[in-house]
């Protein structure tokens, strides 16, 4: 389906910085419908509020906004983001291995929902703001994951649907996403990256650390209030 000369696309918008910039960027290519998924995460209410703020910023009509609840991911557990019994760890950007904030196979669930909706509304492109190069190392954010998902979509959807999942930022550094967002005038204050729920971002979880480092490296002030703002600058090898 095309609207206004552009194909219809679905952007997965979590309410975070990456998906905010990605959604703005993808309006150049597609007329967007926006999808948000509640999965029992600690910051569910804050993320949902940011999703609606992004939708208003992009002037996406309510008929092209979808909010879906899949609380079963919290029932499954296994992640500090969905299980209050597992503490959100202090930031360690040099950590190797998969952190406890990884929600097992989450992106497969999100993409599957987006594909189902795409078949119904005639969308061709599905956009997700996954970042592999400068991130926490989640396995379902890797390029090969999305390649495999596209093969599954090709085999598992109606012939001629032409649905493709795109992760346009997967190879970018986060500072480049900040610079791109600044150049497009995105409202960073309407995004939330912290793994904890609070009036202010904690500044001490991995997600806050990655965001603070990205803004610092980009030389752009982060408009979010933080409980604390440690220096997460990369150490020089010299």
Residue ranges and their predicted role:
Residues 28-29, 51-53, 198, 216, ...:
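Alpha-helix termini
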Residues 126, 195-201, 220-228:
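Charge-dense, low-complexity polyampholytic segments
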